[in-house]
C-alpha cells in the first residue's frame, strides 16, 4: 500500500502539469485572436494625437507647394523654349525692331539739326511778350550772344548745348513732354503749318491782302510784313486779365507720368516759351532746313514789344532785311510801313507816297490802347 501510495503521489503532480500545459496551449490562440473591447460610454484618446496630425498636414502642404512650384517653373521654361523655336522670321524681326526702339529712344543728329537754331539777339526784338526768357534746363536767362534751339511743336526754347544732350537720349520736349518725332513732309510750308497749329501762344498772321502779305523777290524770300491784329489775339478775361488757355491750365494742371508737375502752369510757363509771329517762325524753319546751321534773322527794331497784344507802337522805322548766302550776297531791302488802325492791319509799300488813311499824329492811332500804357498818358 505504501508503494502504491508513493506512486500515486508522484503521478498526481505530473498529471497536473500536463493538464495545465494543455489548458495553456488551448487558451493561447483564443487570447491572440480576440480584440480588446471598450465600453460604449468611454473613449480612448491619446494626448499626442492632435499634434501629430497638425505636423503631418503641414509637411504635406509644404511638400505639395515645393513640388508644384518646381513643376510650374519647369513647364514654363519648356513652353518658352518651344515658342521661341516655333517663332517665324517676321516675329523675330518685330522683336529686333522692338528691342532697338527700347534701347535707342533719342533723336539722331540729323533730326536734331532740323530744329531751328538761332541767336537770341536775332529774335529778341520781334518776340511777343515782356520779361526775360530762360532755359528750363539750366535755369539761366538768355543773353544776346547765346545760341538757342526752338522746339517747333510747343515753342519752348533752350540753349542748344543744354537741349542737345537731352534730345540725344529722349524724343520729347524736356519741359512739356511733347512728342518731337513728326513725319517728314516734302513741302516746308506744310510742315511749318502743322507745327504752328499746336502752339496756343503765337499770333497768326493772315495771308489776306487786306491784313498783310508776304512778298517774294528773285534773290530771297523776305519777310515783308508782320501782321499784329487784335482779332487774332487770344481773348482775355475781364476780371483776371488772363487768357482762356491760361485759366484752363490753372483749373486743370497737366499730369505727368511721375505724378508731379514740372513747373507751375500759370505765369511761370511764359519764361520758357518764345512766342513769335507765324511768319517769323516759318522763316526760321526754312532757314534751319536749307542752311543747316545757325539761322540769321533780319535785324528789326521793335517798338513797344513788351505788350502782349502785339500792337505796333509809335515808331515807324524801316525794317532792313538781309541774309548772306553761299553763292551771292543778298540785297538789303528797306520797307516803310503805314498802319491802318481802322482795319487793324499792317500794309507794306515800296513807294514813298504816304497813304491817305495814315493818322496825323501818334496819339490818333493809340487812343484805343491808352490802358496798356502804364507810364505815358496822352
UniProtKB/Swiss-Prot annotation:
Compositional bias per record (Polar residues), positions renumbered to this chain: 193-207
One Pfam assignment: zf-RING_2
Protein name as annotated: E3 ubiquitin-protein ligase ATL9
Signal peptide extent: 1-33
Record EC number: 2.3.2.27
RING-type zinc finger segments: 135-177
Keywords: Membrane, Metal-binding, Plant defense, Signal, Transferase, Transmembrane, Transmembrane helix, Ubl conjugation pathway, Zinc, Zinc-finger
Residue spans of biased composition, Low complexity class: 301-317
Membrane-topology descriptor: Single-pass membrane protein
Disruption phenotype: Susceptibility to powdery mildew pathogen E.cichoracearum.
Region (Disordered) location: 187-211, 300-326, 350-378
Domains: entry comment: The RING-type zinc finger domain mediates binding to an E2 ubiquitin-conjugating enzyme.
Role, per record: E3 ubiquitin-protein ligase able to catalyze polyubiquitination with ubiquitin-conjugating enzyme E2 UBC8 in vitro. May be involved in the early steps of the plant defense signaling pathway.
Stretches that traverse the bilayer: 51-71
Pathway(s) where this gene product acts: Protein modification; protein ubiquitination
Main location (coarse class): membrane
UniProt family annotation: Belongs to the RING-type zinc finger family. ATL subfamily.
UniProt-listed GO biological process terms: defense response to fungus; protein ubiquitination; response to chitin
Organism: Arabidopsis thaliana (Mouse-ear cress)
Gene Ontology molecular function terms on file: ubiquitin-protein transferase activity; zinc ion binding
InterPro entries: ATL1/ATL16-like, Znf_RING, Znf_RING/FYVE/PHD
Highest taxon, organism lineage: Eukaryota
